[in-house]
């Protein structure tokens, strides 16, 4: 009887220990370690070094060669996996594409697919694959049910959590290439020089993983940060303010992606406060970003509490503006007219 109790106790301890060791942070990347695979790349770079190291540690098959090569059938982040002569070749026009190829090869191994059977060609269905965080600067998360925000703004840029790299790795492993760091109910402070340096610290970690940073911005930021008397998108001083701010941003973060804007909805300021349309507001921001190839994601989920039909309101505001937005503006609609509807 004592032996049976001891055995059950021992099993329970082992089980609990294993449970404690698994915190879910590795997601699908629970990969073999120290496989010491033979991997070659055309050169060294932060991105290629990651691809080589991931394969070197976890790939258990034939030698792998990474090749940067133009291919009319491949988009910039597309890739091809080919097996011949007991060697696997990964090709892509870009380093990021090769990183995606490396993760795809490891995914095929993890799911038991026969890598030697066929040639694999992959192209992304969407060029922009962006996560939108609803994280506030005090680390609370709107509609967040899993603890505090990853971004510890008080400690940035001097203290860099290991979780930032793990976050970038997880995103790259499934092809995510952009992230909006902050809540659409944005604080103007995110555009201050102090906070742009904090954003830079994250962008520098994310960059080798092909992950670009975007920010939600408050439309009235010129009034909040520099005491302008207006945020009218047709006012020359306002236009100049955004141009100078964008110049500062791209000096600090050269590959910055652009802005996400929630305007004239749920109390947020916007162009309609100054008698302007959503198109005029979005286009002003887009023109300032255009020299840097940045984009504006302008939310179409807008409504006033005075009208219960939210779907109708959004339609009435945006349908007449069809065709008036700049080419680097994306009018971002929700899956449905209300929050959290399934596609």
List each model region and its residues:
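Catalytic-core regions of glycoside hydrolase
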Residues: 227-343
């Amino acid at each position: 009887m004592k032996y049976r109790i001891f055995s059950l106790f021992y099993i329970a301890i082992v089980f609990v220990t294993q449970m404690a060791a698994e915190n879910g942070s590795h997601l699908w990347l629970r990969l073999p370690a120290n496989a010491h695979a033979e991997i070659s790349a055309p050169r060294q770079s932060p991105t290629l070094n990651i691809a080589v190291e991931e394969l070197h540690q976890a790939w258990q098959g034939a030698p792998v060669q990474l090749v940067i090569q133009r291919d009319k059938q491949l988009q910039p982040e597309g890739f091809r996996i080919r097996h011949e002569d007991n060697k696997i070749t990964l090709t892509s026009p870009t380093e990021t594409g090769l990183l995606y190829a490396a993760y795809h090869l490891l995914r095929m191994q993890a799911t038991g697919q026969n890598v030697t059977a066929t040639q694999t060609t992959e192209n992304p269905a969407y060029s922009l694959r962006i996560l939108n965080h609803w994280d506030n600067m005090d680390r609370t998360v709107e509609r967040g049910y899993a603890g505090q925000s990853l971004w510890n703004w008080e400690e940035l840029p001097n203290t860099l959590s290991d979780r930032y790299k793990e976050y970038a790795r997880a995103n790259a492993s499934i092809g995510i290439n952009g992230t909006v760091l902050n809540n659409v109910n944005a604080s103007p402070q995110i555009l201050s020089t102090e906070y742009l340096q904090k954003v830079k610290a994250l962008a520098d970690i994310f960059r080798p993983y092909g992950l670009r940073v975007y920010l939600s911005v408050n439309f009235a930021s010129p009034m909040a940060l520099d005491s302008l008397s207006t945020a009218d998108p047709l006012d020359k001083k306002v236009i100049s303010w955004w141009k100078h701010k964008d110049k500062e941003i791209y000096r600090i973060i050269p590959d910055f992606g652009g802005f996400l804007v929630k305007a004239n909805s749920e109390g947020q300021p916007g162009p309609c406060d100054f008698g302007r349309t959503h198109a005029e507001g979005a286009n002003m921001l887009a023109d300032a970003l255009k020299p840097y190839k940045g984009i504006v994601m302008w939310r179409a989920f807008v409504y006033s509490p005075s009208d219960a039909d939210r779907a109708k309101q959004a339609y009435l505001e945006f349908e007449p503006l069809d065709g008036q937005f700049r080419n680097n503006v994306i009018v971002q609609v929700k899956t449905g007219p209300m929050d959290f509807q399934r596609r």
